Amino acid sequence: MADGFSLNDALAGSGNPNPQGWPGAWGNQPGAGGYPGASYPGAYPGQAPPGAYPGQAPPGAYPGPTAPGAYPGPAPGAYPGQPGASGAYPSAPGAYPAAGPYGAPTGALTVPYKLPLAGGVMPRMLITIMGTVKPNANRIILNFLRGNDIAFHFNPRFNENNRRVIVCNTKQDNNWGREERQSAFPFESGRPFKIQVLVEADHFKVAVNDAHLLQYNHRMKNLREINQMEISGDITLTSAAPTMI
């Protein structure tokens, strides 16, 4: 791949203990309390001693908290704006960076749901979508939009001629391009799901339920113009948020 990452680096369970800066193996959660890109568990990026903030003497302490390793805020381990949230980013054990600096909506979201991507997408942006597939579902649709064009159409179909298939495509000037079809199908009616879309310089990567699923090469090269994602289909949507890794 153009970015220098091998598929072994990207796949969960590759056996690589430090897959070149990924937050744990691709599609998986980092270790307990790990901040994306940190070299030590609980460490903020760029720290030398384990858990210590630059210039701080006590290891593991963030400026100001009473408990070692606590993030500033009303509750230990809670991200600002999410007081008392159990398992909140970034310091709770096993927490995945789903909310990131953007914050994540809470409660059920209205579908179709449009997620603004201010400034467009860019390499190392990770969008995490969580929800539950409805019983007797027909399809799920994720569209990365550039105005009226669809840069990346991700469309799991539960019953296309009695078969389950995932269709990916691009729509430009009201014309669909060549379909790319994927037979691996990790979704189940009535079951919860987590979709992660990682933007790279020349492609999107998609993981579902912590396992790498597919890669889709960019057909629209100006990523900054892709500034919105639309989520629709037969799902109950609980969260959708971007972060940088």
Curated annotation (Swiss-Prot):
Residue positions of motif Nuclear export signal: 221-236
GO CC terms, sorted: cytoplasm; extracellular space; immunological synapse; spliceosomal complex
Keyword check for Lyase: no
Location of region: Disordered: 1-30, 47-68
Keyword Nucleotide-binding on entry: no
GO biological process: cell differentiation; eosinophil chemotaxis; innate immune response; macrophage chemotaxis; monocyte chemotaxis; mRNA processing; negative regulation of endocytosis; negative regulation of extrinsic apoptotic signaling pathway
Residues annotated as domain Galectin: 113-243
Subcellular localization: Cytoplasm; Nucleus; Secreted
Biological role: Galactose-specific lectin which binds IgE. May mediate with the alpha-3, beta-1 integrin the stimulation by CSPG4 of endothelial cells migration. Together with DMBT1, required for terminal differentiation of columnar epithelial cells during early embryogenesis. In the nucleus: acts as a pre-mRNA splicing factor. Involved in acute inflammatory responses including neutrophil activation and adhesion, chemoattraction of monocytes macrophages, opsonization of apoptotic neutrophils, and activation of mast cells.
Protein name, as recorded: Galectin-3
Taxonomic lineage of the native organism: Eukaryota, Metazoa, Chordata, Craniata, Vertebrata
